[in-house]
């Protein structure tokens, strides 16, 4: 979501300001009968929205228990920029600025023995560059796309020092930045989707397609630009959700495409595009027969069809857990309306089914993660907020934790 893309959904970060009365209430846990409790090492990020739905404050903390009878506030949390993203590698937790660039990239160390999160080194980035994510090539090398600047920084995660950069401005459709999203490494290549958003914070009307740069991780050179133009699916990946780009068991790369993010009633196309694993770089390209525009697929268990897709996690066997939006649930303001529906998708059968027991959520609290036998959904619902678990094997759901503010990120250390 962010300046071009982020500005649509959050405009600017206003930390520590008055939040909606609804978001400031501390909801009481409502235990699910026979709900399981879990103990472990977890990282949680929650956010409180202001009345405009585009600004607010976010909090990052370590917790050690998931229980339907427990609630967690933000009194022991580290305040981080609103709409900031989180990256975790081993015991290293990274918080990345979302908008103004003043925060940069901050590294925390997680101690599993005592469950403590300790703030460490910081790497500054240019103002308004928006360093939303990074992908490790090795322990000493990582790629950090700067969404607004048209560059990909190369840095050492151990020293938190920049070591180089890749200029990708020439691949922008109409301005100076192609708006790099979240990439993935397959073999010796870094596949970096380009959102290509215009000044109205939406895909260009004359560029409704999905572009991906293929970068050689040994030379740091762009080898080729590939594009899926057949289905007109646009906005591939998102800058802040690593699971929006994933590989299946065959190492075929699938990329979530949000399209107009539900803001254009005349264009509700969203779904997935695919780069099959051909092995040879010369044969690497999209396969449009594997693309799936979900806009015409009914959501089983509801009267709706999706007008965009917010977030996904690949479960294996062609199954995907996701949050999708339905236009009919936009009552007042798409920034704050509870229009997000938790669903189970089948990439092979091309079906979408509502997951019962997960409250509808807003467009920001849409984090999804896998933990043990569960899919964990972060939710900011009308009556309930927090983490909810879904067991794909049994089809059962339960609330795992009540939070102050919407839960938008969860991670379990194995």
Region locations from a protein language model:
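Bacterial Sec-dependent N-terminal signal peptides
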Residues: 2-43
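Short glycine/acidic-enriched loop and turn motifs that connect beta-strands
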Residues: 48-53, 99-102, 148-151, 197-201, ...
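Post-signal peptide N-terminal segment of secreted/secretory-pathway proteins
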Residues: 59-154
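Beta-propeller blade signature
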Residues: 61-63, 205-220, 268-280, 337-347, ...
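Beta-propeller fold detector
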Residues: 69-78, 115-125, 162-171, 222-230, ...
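Repeated scaffold domains used in trafficking and secretory/extracellular systems
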Residues: 79-89, 127-135, 175-183, 234-244, ...
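Short, conserved, GDST-rich strand-edge loop motifs in beta-rich repeat architectures
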Residues: 192-209, 255-269, 322-337
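Loop/turn-rich, solvent-exposed surfaces of beta-rich toroidal or solenoidal domains
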Residues: 304-373, 377
